[in-house]
Amino acid sequence: MAPSQLAWLLRLAAFFHLCTLLAGQHLGMTKCNITCHKMTSPIPVTLLIHYQLNQESCGKRAIILETRQHRHFCADPKEKWVQDAMKHLDHQTAALTRNGGKFEKRVDNVTPRITSATRGLSPTALAKPESATVEDLTLEPTAISQEARRPMGTSQEPPAAVTGSSPSTSKAQDAGLAAKPQSTGISEVAAVSTTIWPSSAVYQSGSSLWAEEKATESPPTIALSTQASTTSSPKQNVGSEGQPPWVQEQDSTPEKSPGPEETNPVHTDIFQDRGPGSTVHPSVAPTSSEKTPSPELVASGSQAPKVEEPIHATADPQKLSVFITPVPDSQAATRRQAVGLLAFLGLLFCLGVAMFAYQSLQGCPRKMAGEMVEGLRYVPRSCGSNSYVLVPV
């Protein structure tokens, strides 16, 4: 009796184990997340943010509507208000996709540089703090390209006025005109303007760099105004009406130029020792007979500063969410069912082999059966046991 009960218990345990393993095999293609039992009433389109179709495994086709509070409702796709809501949400999603938005990213902290000749202002003077004295302004080289003259033959034209370095009289200074140089030969004089772009290193050095510049420059080449006063007065702004209020730096025009072509030297070696933070751009403005400064600064061996444009990129807003409905794969589901069935059959085979081995081990040979007496046979209870059971033959 005991071996048979143990065998039945093993069979029941194996059966329940197989039922547990194969409980979901017949639902291999079922991916229905929301089961719709009741359809909802009409919902205003202003409260809806998204819709999607339910899965094919759900059986009854329905539209899943999602509200702003992320609640889901089932709706009948055949109703008119459901179709209008779907069109409204499709139009809203398409508009958001076309107008994805724009963000700008700054690559570095480079600020756009303004050409001094076209603006008429010096970048260093614009960036000067309010506490700067007039001495710093007078010692600062301007970035304005001075008006150059090209006298041909015996032509006499008044050059641009020079503040603080013009050899004209006070009456000519009040009128804004300098002395007229006379030349019998062909001469070409180019006004040299040294443009210094502002940097943090130049700002930190302060006025000591400008004092060093004044000490190293040669007096006959560049004449700097030596006025130093902390209070500005209208009398210091002497010159033509087109000149800026601060003092300008200009090379003095030589009156005697026997050569056919002469250009004033450019002193840039004092700016080369200022470190990597400061960049010196020597520029030579071509001569012209007009009284307006040249709009372009052309320098041999130097390029115009390039302004890096910010990078524009388009990106979808974070609120725009794309819901991808998974499509059930019939082949994968069939493959899973086949694997489960094979596993079930293999487990049954193993269980049968185990039961057969158990019965063969527990069985007793025929010689161990007792003798038959008067139609009754003595059968031992188990192999090797001394207790017998009388079995009628």
Curated annotation (Swiss-Prot):
Signal sequence residues: 1-24
Extent of Polar residues compositional bias: 153-172, 223-240
Family: Belongs to the intercrine delta family.
Subunit structure: Monomer. Forms a ternary complex with CX3CR1 and ITGAV:ITGB3 or ITGA4:ITGB1.
Topological domain spans for side Cytoplasmic: 359-393
Extracellular face residues: 25-337
Primary location class: membrane
One cellular component term from this protein's GO annotations in UniProt: cell body
UniProt GO BP: angiogenesis involved in wound healing; antimicrobial humoral immune response mediated by antimicrobial peptide; autocrine signaling; cell adhesion; cell chemotaxis; cell-cell adhesion; cellular response to tumor necrosis factor; chemokine-mediated signaling pathway
Topological relation to the membrane, as annotated: Single-pass type I membrane protein
Transmembrane segments annotated in the record for this chain: 338-358
Keyword line: Cell adhesion, Cell membrane, Chemotaxis, Cytokine, Disulfide bond, Glycoprotein, Inflammatory response, Membrane, Secreted, Signal, Transmembrane, Transmembrane helix
Protein name: Fractalkine
Top-level taxonomy: Eukaryota, Metazoa, Chordata, Craniata, Vertebrata
Tissue specificity annotation: Highest levels in brain (neurons). Significant levels in kidney, heart, lung and adrenal gland.
PANTHER family referenced in this protein's UniProt entry, alphabetically: FRACTALKINE, SMALL INDUCIBLE CYTOKINE A
